């Protein structure tokens, strides 16, 4: 293909095993936090490897609206913070980014003035009460649509008090919103999780000089401002998952993803791949700016079914759609439970993947909090309604590898720009051919 598709329908056709070495774009979670924490800091923050995608653009526009200056300089993104965050002059549009909206809700709760946070049609259907309730317990003045369930969110910033918050569901976004509000609060703020969620907020704040106390599943902060500094963003394991899962299940495949973030709160996928029998190894393991990274190689092998539940779920929640695809090629019954969080992402990902894979021939049973998939099952070509969800689109592009040459037609791929604009170019690079406009 001559150029990666950016919008409109797209037809994927299999072109043999996946082979090669690639680098995926910067981690989305770390990229968001780099910009936001830089805006909160007392000094300049310089970021390398920042993800260039729509979600991160939303955070950049938001911090600029709060008075930060963000510029590109010599291959780095430089964030110069204001002396104090200012009241925004207009509504802050977070686009499709739930991370932007939730983390900003925590920050703006402690910033004097009126702020309104909204987003696109998809974001305005995503729940915010789980953030509003704990922030209100700290004294935040917040309101939202539909009985405080849905965005837009209106924030009237003011004094906050520290509190001990026990979360019913492990969520890095909710945890981070509370901790960021805690930087503005009087007294200590503590978050207790039922399971460990991704810990980029804790690592990055500590790296910027904020005292962060971690004890088991408890995290505590007190009022402080980060000092700024340097952030080197590793590759995003959630983006790499499409290639790693495809390589694990497609005979003859071997893919290496270089400079990949392997923070232990994000490597549930690697544990699952090993449990299913794939060959997985890490090389060049090192730690940069507080985040471990490595070159990760996956080689195809005969996959066996496994169970995925409990503490593993928060460590691979975003990867589960493509794990569901991989499970169709594993021998036996793969069971995923405790993943109800999938129902409140950009789409109801359990329902979307279940319905689409079933039409493609998969033997799948859905539960309220997960699914069971029998395999191995040859898939067939299918037309996919992506629901404007980037992970549905990319997961079903991978599913096409197992369709025996039959095409998978995605109704619109513009959503891929949310997190991974170069996805189809890299997929082409490691051997899967795509074509645009519905043509083979």
Curated annotation (Swiss-Prot):
CDD domains cross-referenced by the UniProt entry = EPSP_synthase
Residues annotated as binding phosphoenolpyruvate: 28, 98, 126, 173, 349, 391
Q: Active-site positions, per UniProt?
A: 318
Q: How does it assemble?
A: Monomer.
Q: Which domain of life is it from?
A: Bacteria
Task: List the InterPro entries.
Answer: Enolpyruvate_Tfrase_dom, Enolpyruvate_Tfrase_sf, EPSP_synthase, EPSP_synthase_CS, RNA3'P_cycl/enolpyr_Trfase_a/b
Question: What is this protein's record name?
Answer: 3-phosphoshikimate 1-carboxyvinyltransferase
Pathway(s) of this molecule: Metabolic intermediate biosynthesis; chorismate biosynthesis; chorismate from D-erythrose 4-phosphate and phosphoenolpyruvate: step 6/7
Question: Where in the cell is the protein located?
Answer: Cytoplasm
């Amino acid at each position: 293909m001559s150029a990666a598709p950016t919008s409109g329908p797209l037809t994927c056709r299999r072109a043999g095993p996946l082979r090669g070495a690639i680098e995926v774009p910067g981690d989305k979670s770390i990229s968001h936090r780099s910009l936001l924490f830089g805006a909160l800091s007392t000094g300049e923050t310089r970021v390398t490897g920042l993800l260039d995608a729509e979600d991160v653009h939303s955070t950049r526009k938001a911090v600029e609206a709060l008075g930060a200056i963000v510029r590109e300089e010599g291959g780095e993104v430089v964030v110069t913070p204001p002396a104090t965050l200012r009241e925004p002059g207009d509504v802050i549009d977070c686009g499709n980014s739930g991370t932007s909206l939730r983390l900003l809700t925590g920050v703006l709760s402690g910033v004097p003035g009126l702020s309104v946070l909204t987003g696109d049609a998809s974001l305005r259907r995503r729940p915010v009460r789980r953030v509003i309730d704990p922030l209100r317990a700290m004294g935040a003045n917040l309101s939202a649509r539909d009985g405080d369930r849905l965005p837009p969110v209106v924030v009237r910033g003011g004094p906050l008090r520290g509190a001990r918050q026990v979360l019913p569901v492990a969520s890095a976004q909710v945890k981070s919103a509370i901790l960021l509000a805690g930087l503005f609060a009087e007294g200590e703020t503590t978050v207790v999780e039922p399971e460990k969620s991704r810990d980029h907020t804790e690592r990055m704040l500590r790296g910027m000089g904020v005292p962060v106390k971690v004890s088991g599943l408890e995290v505590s902060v007190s009022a402080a401002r980060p000092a700024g500094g340097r952030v080197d963003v590793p590759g995003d394991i959630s983006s790499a998952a499409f290639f790693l899962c495809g390589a694990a299940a497609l005979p003859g495949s071997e893919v290496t993803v270089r400079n990949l973030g392997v923070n232990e709160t994000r490597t549930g996928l690697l544990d699952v791949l090993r449990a299913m029998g794939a060959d997985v190894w890490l090389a060049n393991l090192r730690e940069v700016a507080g985040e471990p990274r490595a070159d990760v190689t996956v080689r195809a092998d005969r996959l066996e079914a496994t169970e995925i539940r409990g503490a593993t779920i928060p460590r691979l929640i975003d990867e589960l759609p493509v794990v569901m695809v991989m499970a169709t090629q594993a021998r036996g019954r793969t069971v995923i439970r405790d993943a109800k969080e999938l129902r409140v992402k950009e789409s109801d990902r359990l329902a979307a993947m279940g319905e689409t894979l079933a039409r493609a021939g998969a033997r799948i049973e859905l539960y309220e909090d997960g699914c069971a998939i029998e395999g191995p099952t040859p898939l067939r070509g299918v037309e996919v309604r992506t629901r404007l969800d980037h992970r549905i689109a990319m997961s079903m592009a991978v599913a096409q590898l197992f369709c025996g040459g039959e095409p998978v037609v995605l109704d619109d791929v513009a959503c891929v720009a949310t997190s991974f604009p170069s996805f189809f170019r890299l997929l082409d690079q490691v051997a899967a051919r795509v074509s645009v406009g519905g043509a083979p």
